[in-house]
Amino acid sequence: MQIDATIDKNLAKVTEKVTRPQRSRSYNLCVKADALRFAKLYKEAVQAYLQAIMMDRKEPQAYFGLAMSYKYLQEYKKAISTLHKLIVIDDSKDDYFFELGVCYLSNGEPEKAIEHLIKAILINRENLEAQIQLAIAHELVDEADLSLMIYNKLIETNPEFLKAYYNKAAMLMGQGDFMEASRTFFQLIKRNPDYYKAYLGIAMSFDKMSKFKDAIRYYKKFLELNQFSEDAVFARKRIEELRVEHFSRDNSLSLVKSGDGIDF
């Protein structure tokens, strides 16, 4: 019986070693660094990731975590350099190329962002955020036609992806096409009536088209959903300006006040 018990104990130890392999010091440092990064202690995370890399220069997790820490510290050149080292080790993940593209965008280099965002999309065509960032990059290098094509394709294939509507409308406003921008914002609120930024976009578009009564109406709708923000301050001020300039005798266009209720 004693022999059987000893054998059972030895088997248990072997099984534990198989199911719970010893973790390397590098791995343990990565776990610690990840915890620091998730706690937004980015400088401390950088040090832990660097230590992990010194112990194992082929650990993708350490390079990715280090790059993300640099990104949140706005040290984009260091993040870019780290991500380039990472994709030499592992070029199979769309996240790596996506983050590289985003860092290039953040560093004011949209032309370099484009190729990496395209690679991210080729690896994972479901990466909708990569497609959004690619559209932004094309807009920044004066290729608005390509941006528009990307937004339209996103809206066609992923009609619930509201960011595509919003970014497309914002780009159209920047181009001075306020009519088409307002149409796109209307498509957005059809999908989500609580998307308050769309009401502000509609109001500003009508404002620019000198459709002041409609502008006031949508500034008010925006304020119904969002009363306490810098944009709300702007909307109230603009309603008052338009009321005084164009509708001073029309009491139905009174100012929407901040507070618990909304005064029409």
Language model features with spans:
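Terminal, low-structured helical/coil segments at or just beyond the last alpha-helical repeat
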Residues: 5-12, 17, 216-264
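Structural signature of tandem alpha-helical TPR/SEL1-like repeats
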Residues: 8-11, 39-50, 72-85, 106-119, ...
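Alpha-helical segment of the N-proximal tetratricopeptide repeat
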Residues: 22-55, 61, 65-74, 95, ...
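Start-of-helix register in tetratricopeptide repeats
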Residues: 27, 61, 95, 129, ...
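Canonical tetratricopeptide repeat
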Residues: 31, 65-68, 72, 99, ...
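TPR/TPR-like alpha-solenoid repeats
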Residues: 35, 69, 89, 103, ...
